[in-house]
Amino acid sequence: MGLKIHRPRRGSMAYYPRKRASDIVPRIRNWPVIDLGKPTLLGFVGYKAGMVHVTVVDDRKTSPFFGKELVKAVTVVETPPLYVVGLRAYAINPLKAELVSVGEAWVNIPNEVRKYIARRIPTLPEKFDTDKALADLQGLLDSVSYIKVIAMTQPYKAGVGKKTPEVLEIPVGGVPTIDEQFKYASGLLGKEVKPTDVFKPGQLVDVIGVTKGKGTQGVIKRFGVKELPRWHKHRKGSRRTGTVGPKPAVMYTQPRMGQMGFHRRTEYNKRILKISDNGSEITPKGGFKHYGIVRSGYMLIEGSTPGVVKRLIAFRYPIRPPFNYDLKQVQAPSVTWVSVMGVSGVS
């Protein structure tokens, strides 16, 4: 007879509840603690443009293909620079074990940038006393646990066809002392941050995004339940479960129809193959399908990433890297060829 496999569903219970994400901009709940010897932002964001394939020299010394060219599928993520509009300091409330904002400082935003961020924050004041706010924060650093910059995306510099930016907080890390983090964040106020200021080619990152939405789906597509034979004893349907159990208590483990897709998901330890400021070198003939032209810088991420094109994807330093991974000894891979074949097949 052999082993009888009991598989009531193919969907993992680790992803419950399977409901729609609260926001299309992914929220990052945890950040790693890293030591680089210099301060840096712990994350970055970009817009998914599409996928291409490249040839890259395998640099894994334990691989049987070491030193040989491999064909890999990669995701092109357009990364227009972030504009830092402020910083915020947080302290830990010992009674509730939660972060509490103790102060913030905003920069006087120039008019060419203000007209865009006003779409997201209509009540933004005209002027800020940045020096006074920074001086007040300087006196509170003894009680501060985290320093985060307030950054806005610049989609009007990308090919996504939108002008309203997203405003998000990105913590500062890389050094253990708050004084160094505060000094670094203060120096970023009113400046642009590029992906090369945060990451470097060859390193691993965690990719956080909202997956492609598929609406309401049945148990066959949603959980991979085995379809029943179509004969007279299954007159109540074949694309359904045989039984949901006795009433009135139906177990939450029972596969049911419902929302599929548009979930916030994290993919760990994706490798950055390339970072460049020249988007024209990666744009296929005729542009990316449903996206267009990469107008600013871009990153090549090995493999696939969650979400559809034009969707915002967040990157952070790896929170659970391999045991033999050293951030200080990252080597850039050798990308020898990139496919820029257009949709029509014309290269």
From Swiss-Prot:
Q: Which GO terms describe its molecular function?
A: rRNA binding; structural constituent of ribosome
Provide the alphabetized UniProt keywords.
Answer: Ribonucleoprotein, Ribosomal protein, RNA-binding, rRNA-binding
Gene Ontology CC entries for this record:
cytosolic large ribosomal subunit
Tagged with keyword RNA-binding: yes
Record's keyword annotation contains Disulfide bond: no
Q: Which InterPro entries match?
A: L3_arc_euk, Ribosomal_L3_dom_3_arc_sf, Ribosomal_uL3, Ribosomal_uL3_arc, Ribosomal_uL3_CS, Transl_B-barrel_sf
Q: Where is the signal peptide?
A: none
Please give a single GO biological process term from the UniProt record: translation
Subunit structure comment from the entry: Part of the 50S ribosomal subunit. Forms a cluster with proteins L14 and L24e.
Role of this protein: One of the primary rRNA binding proteins, it binds directly near the 3'-end of the 23S rRNA, where it nucleates assembly of the 50S subunit.
| Family as reported in the entry's similarity comment | Belongs to the universal ribosomal protein uL3 family.
Query: Which protein is depicted?
Result: Large ribosomal subunit protein uL3
The organism is Caldivirga maquilingensis (strain ATCC 700844 / DSM 13496 / JCM 10307 / IC-167)
Q: Which gene produces this protein?
A: rpl3
